[in-house]
């Protein structure tokens, strides 16, 4: 009897084996945002570079420390390498505009300006790591607010899925990252996340890329009141892989519910 109980508990807590679905990613996780159950896991605990998906954490720390309407003065030192929202030294922009530039354009200049405004970069990065610990992201370390490659900057697909679940529950963050296009302060910004236009129920999240990290993608989708989050790291086929994971994952939930109902109906 106890063996049967143990096996039943193991089945409930273990990741669902992804028969019929696969990805091109070096690491991938699909997680149920409502229950925390891992539905699919491929190298989910492997520490890897995460590129600009870092900016999910950056945005969350900003939302802790500043209000969207506050104004930030851009400085020369905020001009950094990589993707940009094309800020100019001396201009004044709101925190909300910078958050759009961070999440839609993946602006490293926006990340630098926000971190500097919210207590300075060193303090800001400490809070990024502090929040990571609070969320149980034990295999994660942040070294900067933008996601540029650094030996001390890494995470795992599982940890990023935990972060995505937390982020999806923040209404302001969810509104910002699911915006397809916006014009604020004379700038028109278009979301890099193609899934918003191609995957039913997608509520966005964050793309990323560096030569060393490859393509990284964190996303969330909601269908029929259920919400899933997907993470792929080092995946050249990430758009298609996320679409396939969601189609499989939402169908998997339906199959499990149907099986449960069938068991209840069995005399």
Which role does the model predict for each range below?
Residues 2-12:
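Bacterial N-terminal signal peptides
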Residues 7-8, 16, 139, 236:
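Intrinsically disordered regions, especially transient/low-confidence alpha-helical propensity segments
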Residues 10-11, 33, 183, 197:
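Short, positively charged
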Residues 14-158, 165-169:
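Active-site-adjacent loops and short helices of periplasmic peptidoglycan-processing enzymes
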